[in-house]
Amino acid sequence: MSKLHIKKGDTVYVNAGEDKGKTGRVLKVLVKEGRAIVEGINMVSKSTKPNAKNPQGGIVKQEASIHISNLNPVDPKTGKATRIGRRKSSEGTLVRYSKKSGEEI
């Protein structure tokens, strides 16, 4: 599997699927499955039994995972979807940068 271009906390643009065109923040990355959970994207209804948090139970909306091939990071400078590159910083560590603007992410 190739390196993932998405990390927790990134703002991403959805480029395919039911939520195409929306942006959201990555809450969790599922590395082995190649999927990510994005805030407010791919919402599903889930039935829950009554518990201490929700004494009534019922139907709850929550985010489902989405494949990372359907996500693009958002350029911090322009606010549009971009591709990601990696380059060495002056300290010698690899940093991610936007291919469109050259800005570090």
From Swiss-Prot:
Region (Disordered): 67-105
Entry-linked Gene3D superfamilies: 2.30.30.30
UniProt cross-references to Pfam families, sorted A to Z: KOW (PF00467), ribosomal_L24 (PF17136)
Domain of life: Bacteria
Record GO biological process: translation
Keywords: Ribonucleoprotein, Ribosomal protein, RNA-binding, rRNA-binding
GO cellular component, one term: cytosolic large ribosomal subunit
GO molecular function, one term: structural constituent of ribosome
Keyword Metal-binding (UniProt): no
Residue spans crossing the bilayer: none
Membrane recorded as keyword: no
Similarity annotation: Belongs to the universal ribosomal protein uL24 family.
Function: One of two assembly initiator proteins, it binds directly to the 5'-end of the 23S rRNA, where it nucleates assembly of the 50S subunit.
Description of how the protein assembles with itself and partners: Part of the 50S ribosomal subunit.
Annotated NCBIfam families: rplX_bact
Name of protein: Large ribosomal subunit protein uL24
Organism: Bacteroides thetaiotaomicron (strain ATCC 29148 / DSM 2079 / JCM 5827 / CCUG 10774 / NCTC 10582 / VPI-5482 / E50)
